């Protein structure tokens, strides 16, 4: 972490098909070993499945799913006088999106469907309807913050 000046955030260009920055961020998180075209084909395939299953705009459903998974508050460890406290803190806007995307991908990988396209489509539909593994993850993070509300005065 530099001490002198703030480093400028890298500008992420919108994805070529849907012209959406959030879709581009998701593709960048989904890719493995730099294979972006494969990650794009997986996500676009999931969007095609969403269109068939949900009969709704896949990008709108995707954005709703990410918004439903975004955490508002999380806990951070803070060491005070020999003991470590889980201190609830508000999540920054960019980190909310990053966590939501990460949780959706990790929970999609754990699903029972056969292909990653089907897994992602299922996770998007579930998250958009406020159910599924990624929503459970957000709820557990919020519950942890609620349980440790007594330590909120230990600010960072």
Swiss-Prot record:
Keyword set, alphabetical order: Ribonucleoprotein, Ribosomal protein, RNA-binding, rRNA-binding, tRNA-binding
Keyword tRNA-binding in record: yes
InterPro entries given in the database record: Ribosomal_uS7, Ribosomal_uS7_bac/org-type, Ribosomal_uS7_CS, Ribosomal_uS7_dom, Ribosomal_uS7_dom_sf
Alphabetical list of Pfam families matching this protein: Ribosomal_S7 (PF00177)
GO terms, biological process: translation
GO CC annotation: small ribosomal subunit
Single GO molecular function: tRNA binding
UniProt entry tagged with the keyword Signal: no
Function: One of the primary rRNA binding proteins, it binds directly to 16S rRNA where it nucleates assembly of the head domain of the 30S subunit. Is located at the subunit interface close to the decoding center, probably blocks exit of the E-site tRNA.
NCBIfam families assigned: rpsG_bact
Family membership noted in the UniProt record: Belongs to the universal ribosomal protein uS7 family.
Subunit structure: Part of the 30S ribosomal subunit. Contacts proteins S9 and S11.
Name of this protein: Small ribosomal subunit protein uS7
């Amino acid at each position: 972490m530099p001490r002198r000046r703030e480093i400028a955030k890298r500008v992420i260009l919108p994805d070529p098909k849907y012209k959406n920055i959030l879709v581009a961020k998701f593709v960048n998180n989904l890719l493995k070993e730099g294979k972006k075209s494969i990650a794009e084909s997986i996500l676009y395939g999931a969007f095609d499945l969403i269109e068939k299953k949900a009969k709704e705009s896949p990008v709108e459903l995707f954005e709703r799913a990410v918004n439903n998974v975004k955490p508002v508050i999380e806990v951070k460890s803070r060491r005070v006088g020999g003991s470590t406290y889980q201190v609830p803190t508000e999540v920054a806007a960019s980190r909310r999106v990053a966590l939501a995307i990460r949780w959706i991908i990790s929970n999609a990988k754990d699903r029972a469907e056969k292909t990653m396209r089907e897994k992602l489509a299922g996770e998007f539909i579930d998250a958009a309807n406020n159910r599924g593994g990624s929503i459970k993850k957000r709820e557990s993070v919020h519950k942890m913050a609620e349980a440790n509300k007594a330590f909120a005065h230990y600010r960072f």
